[in-house]
Amino acid sequence: MFAVIKTGGKQYRVAANDVITIGKLEGDAGTAVTFGEVLLYADGDGATKVGAPTVAGVSVAGEIVAQTRGPKVIAFKKRRRQNSRRKRGHRQDFTVVRVTGISAA
């Protein structure tokens, strides 16, 4: 059994006990989260439900494992022969979520 969920403008294929890294969600480690935007649901018997745009009555439950940050990305601009340069760093915030279950009504 698996589902395709949408969160943070991206789509993720998840199953029970999967650990996924998604865009930042508010909450501390151990907080329960629910994803209501399920785009596709497939049970173990081969039956598949495709949403238009979402599947009604299906939700994915998860638990926040950690709040992390990605690697540092450097944006560096330089104008030659002018002693002019600009260096700027960025680190994206991520949330690690463990999927606890998929419930279908």
From Swiss-Prot:
A Gene Ontology cellular-component term: cytoplasm
GO MF annotations, alphabetized: rRNA binding; structural constituent of ribosome
Keywords, ordered alphabetically: Ribonucleoprotein, Ribosomal protein, RNA-binding, rRNA-binding
Disulfide bond entries: none
Protein's GO biological process: translation
Cross-referenced PANTHER family: 50S RIBOSOMAL PROTEIN L21, LARGE RIBOSOMAL SUBUNIT PROTEIN BL21M
Family that this chain belongs to: Belongs to the bacterial ribosomal protein bL21 family.
Function of the molecule: This protein binds to 23S rRNA in the presence of protein L20.
Subunit structure: Part of the 50S ribosomal subunit. Contacts protein L20.
Name of protein: Large ribosomal subunit protein bL21
Lineage summary: Bacteria, Pseudomonadati, Pseudomonadota, Alphaproteobacteria, Hyphomicrobiales
